[in-house]
Design a protein with these regions (language model features):
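Helix-coil-helix junctions within alpha-helical repeat/solenoid scaffolds
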Residues: 1-131
Length: 131
């Protein structure tokens, strides 16, 4: 349930509320949990979303990279696309030099996967981020 709450707050632009849950996301990772059966979301993805909401950019980058490595090793195409989209959202928020270009690359890769899988709502969300 924690993953759904963090992701929900992030998507509803309630980032401060998602950020408050970052310590719980770290606690979840410390249990050794890698994937959540209720959502198939990786715990590192959840922590990345919460860290990004807290503007803890370095931690978010680390979580997203770890999550992407895990998603590629499983492999989980959907989670790879989701990680790329959430990572891109973080980069757009951070807005340091080069972030927008990297975000566009990540979003383009996510868009390709969403199109391949057939996820119209995710295609729309990703296209909106690209605009």
């Amino acid at each position: 349930m924690l993953a759904n709450v963090i992701e929900g707050f992030a998507m509803l632009d309630e980032r401060s509320r998602a950020a408050e849950l970052y310590p719980l996301a770290l606690e979840l990772i410390s249990t050794g949990a890698v994937s959540l059966w209720t959502s198939a979301r990786l715990t590192q993805t959840v922590a990345g979303i919460a860290a990004a909401a807290a503007h803890n950019w370095e931690a978010a980058e680390d979580h997203f990279q770890t999550a992407l490595n895990q998603a590629e090793s499983f492999p989980s195409l959907l989670e790879q696309a989701e990680i790329r989209r959430f990572h891109a959202m973080m980069l757009i928020d951070r807005a340091t030099p080069g972030d927008r270009k990297t975000a566009r690359t990540l979003l383009s890769e996510a868009l390709e996967t969403y199109t391949q899988i057939g996820m119209p709502r995710h295609i729309e969300m990703t296209q909106n981020l690209l605009d």
